[in-house]
């Protein structure tokens, strides 16, 4: 680029497929399959199946392969190490959302503003993921899933204690406990806080692969068993079962009822909204999120060096 050519100020532009960097030849967290996807984390709404290449952290690559198959083409980047794509340099930095989740830092080779895309993020303490790291930048694109003042999370340890108390009460009455939550990240955060002294812990098949990846990364989790026909008797009454929301009301879940039936719960930040528990049709709602709440988002913005924030909703 000649010295008379203006330096582009918009390294990233929104398109139908997602945020696109023309100078780097990649999308960030595309909505549909693309040739090269720089992927902040392994949730399917950020890492759609079918991309020719995923550029991500090693732990995100492990999670993607556990979900989509070992043949997935993943180019892995270590924390803070710069990699050139076309006319830009890219590096990844911990986002605190789930294990391996990354913020994406982008800088043009010929100068101009530094951009950071947080992806989903949080700044809470979480033993199952790398701690959030602030990255100096000029333009900050930050997620805002819970970007309203109504969203305030209780301390995660308080919520996990409530879940254990609920489970123990149910077990004493020979009533099976079922907690629905998302299979990657949230489920492992929940598992890390469960007390195995109360009873056996069963997990849905969709959680088995991701949970094994977490264990391989030396994340401390209690012993679990795969919840199925062969383990139903062991789990009935005393056990707790962690499963995705798609298992609600299925014959699979009904087989685990104890002598006094079962109680169901949903663990999510959305449980902070009145009516969500009824909408989900569960007995209990526990406010446990892998996203920053309103104050968390404000705190994250304040950590940056005078950025120009852009809200991704």
Predicted regions and their residues:
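His/Asp/Glu-rich metal-coordinating catalytic cores
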Residues: 5-32, 36, 42-180, 185
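Structural motif
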Residues: 31, 181-182, 242-248, 267-270, ...
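Short internal beta-strands
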Residues: 53-59, 200-209, 310
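A short, acidic, amphipathic alpha-helical segment used as a generic capping/interface helix at domain edges
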Residues: 163, 248-256, 289-303
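Hard-cation-handling environments
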Residues: 163-177, 181-188, 192-235
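A contiguous, basic/glycine-rich beta-loop/short-helix subdomain that forms a polymer-engagement track
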Residues: 212-264
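A C-terminal functional module that forms or caps the active site or interfaces directly
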Residues: 266-294
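Conserved small/polar residues in nucleotide/adenosyl-binding loops
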Residues: 304-311
